[in-house]
């Protein structure tokens, strides 16, 4: 009960543009629970702190949670960790990996449908819609429509508006024929969240800066300390072509030297940590 009340308070504080207060609410509760040995609640508290980090733009902290505490077990679903799975998908979206987010979300779908988890289903559909939209897959319209239909039926606003700037362009594009009064309230709430947190779930690489498949292959070889000549031989392309690709890669990663590219690529999860 104590966790539920504090969680509601923190979400209300976050929605009101008070992320520092929301963080303090969860951190104080976490410390109290840890002292009392109530460790089973701590993973969800850590996931909630991760969401606050993403709202405030601290993606390094969010990445630390992802590396150290995210479930990352797509073949072994634990429904008690669904809040953490949803958080994991959010980090993956912020990292510019919509495919990874979809892989994380997919196992939740049968459970959510079979057990009629309405709120979880809305979150699942909104996050799936955002991921599909970023993949330029028109299937996002169906998923967002399903989320809006369910949210409107129960008069939920915050369940959708929490995604703020990440869902705003989708809502502006979607031709949804549901309750107009409710939609007006929703759009106002979404715009408020977008104003409070303008970079929430925004990919680190803008669409025009995303690496092409060829550039990703060359990046892997570059980070494996292959020379331009070796890359040209492996890729079966001319040396000037490799040099052009390397130049584009460095520009997109906003670095000057090849050595810096590896660090930037790991931070963006474009290459494995052990490469």
Where are these regions (language model features)?
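Alpha-solenoid helical repeat architecture
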Residues: 1-9, 17, 33-48, 72-87, ...
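Structural motif corresponding to the intra-repeat A-B loop/turn of tetratricopeptide repeats
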Residues: 16, 56, 95, 133-135
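TPR-repeat structural position
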Residues: 19, 39, 59, 98, ...
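Inward-facing hydrophobic residues that define packing positions of alpha-helical scaffold repeats
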Residues: 26, 65-67, 104-106, 112, ...
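TPR/TPR-like (Sel1-like) alpha-helical repeat modules
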Residues: 140-156, 176, 187, 191
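Helix-turn-helix DNA-binding segment
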Residues: 198-247, 251-252, 260-275
């Amino acid at each position: 009960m104590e966790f539920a009340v504090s969680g509601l308070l923190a979400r209300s504080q976050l929605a009101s543009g008070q992320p520092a207060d929301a963080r303090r609410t969860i951190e104080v509760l976490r410390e109290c629970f840890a002292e009392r040995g109530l460790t089973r609640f701590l993973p969800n508290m850590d996931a909630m702190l991760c969401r606050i980090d993403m709202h405030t733009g601290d993606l390094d902290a969010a990445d630390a949670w992802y590396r150290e505490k995210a479930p990352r077990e797509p073949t072994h679903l634990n429904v008690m960790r669904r809040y953490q799975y949803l958080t994991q998908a959010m980090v993956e979206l912020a990292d510019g990996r919509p495919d990874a987010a979809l892989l994380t979300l997919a196992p939740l779908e049968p459970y959510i449908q079979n057990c009629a988890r309405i709120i979880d289903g809305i979150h699942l559909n909104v996050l799936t819609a955002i991921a599909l939209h970023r993949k330029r897959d028109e299937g996002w319209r169906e998923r967002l429509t399903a989320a809006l239909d369910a949210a409107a039926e129960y008069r939920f606003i915050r369940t959708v508006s929490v995604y703020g700037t990440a869902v705003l362009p989708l809502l502006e594009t979607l031709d949804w024929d549901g309750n107009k009064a409710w939609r007006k309230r929703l759009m106002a709430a979404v715009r408020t969240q977008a104003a409070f947190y303008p970079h929430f779930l925004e990919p680190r690489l803008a669409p025009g800066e995303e690496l092409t498949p060829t550039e990703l292959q060359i990046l892997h070889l570059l980070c494996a300390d292959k020379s331009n000549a070796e890359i040209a031989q492996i890729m079966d392309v001319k040396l000037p072509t490799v040099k052009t690709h390397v130049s584009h890669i460095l520009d997109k990663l906003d670095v000057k030297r090849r050595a810096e590219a590896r660090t930037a690529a790991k931070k963006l999860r474009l290459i494995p940590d052990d490469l």
